[in-house]
């Protein structure tokens, strides 16, 4: 179909081409409270060591964050965020060419990160949270990931109440907020992201430097999360590469708990099962055309992404006659 047209994404003069298959992006938390690894990687040495380990396992991108955005987390100042991530970026730039994405929605943090060599800004508000962000990225050569943020789009949703504030109150009118709340989630996403893209263009960021993220897991119902994955092609139909976070999402845990699996992260089985469940989502997202998938553990996601890519690009694969089993 139409959505298999090749998209490109440019950052710092380099190009990601959707015809090359899915890239796994490893999460590097430089926070004392991050939600899945209990702050095990706090301190820049540990963060750098973890990042290099993820690259060794096959990460083709890293997403470095200095502020946890999980439900109930405490916001940190821009300066604190800068102090956490800058040493990590500096160190990694010395020893790897893997693109470094910075998970921040604050313009001063993005500016400091870009100055020390960050390649991509991953803004979970889609340029809505900080009015200076689009200009900061516009003046640079960095790429940007614009995420649909349902917490901002639907402030009245009960799921939105548990998140810290992401700013952006002045971007959408009350009427637009009501409209997004009334629309089916996929249409709400398109409405929101079109506004983000407009803000990007106004700040000097052109289409080739933009990737879109459906915002899976941010204050949405289970049904809505599943619909956004199923309709991933919508982002490609809009003309952009797609970035998806699949890792350790509550709705996956819920689906598998309901099916009778142990998903308790305090137990070894449960912890492992969370990553296996996430990996299933990687196979599906890959097949549906995700260009980058953001994960906690690269090792669990490599096989599913290989299989997903094989199905996705099956038209292009040469016919190989396999030997009989056992021969």
Q: Where are the predicted features?
A:
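Glycine-rich, proline-tolerant flexible connector loops at the mouths of alpha/beta enzymes
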Residues: 34-36, 60-87, 215-222
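Conserved, mostly hydrophobic/aromatic
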Residues: 28, 54, 58, 103, ...
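C-terminal helical cap(s) of enzyme catalytic domains, especially alpha/beta-barrels
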Residues: 295-321
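N-terminal amphipathic alpha-helix/helix-capping segment at the start of soluble metabolic enzymes
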Residues: 2-29, 198-205, 254, 258, ...
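Alpha-helix-loop-beta-strand connector modules within alpha/beta enzyme cores
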Residues: 74-102, 107-111, 139-149, 229-244, ...
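Alpha/beta enzyme core
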Residues: 43-64, 95, 99, 107-120, ...
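Conserved anion-binding
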Residues: 32, 69-70, 116, 128-221
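N-terminal small/glycine-rich loop or linker at the start of catalytic domains
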Residues: 14-40, 72, 89-90, 147-181, ...
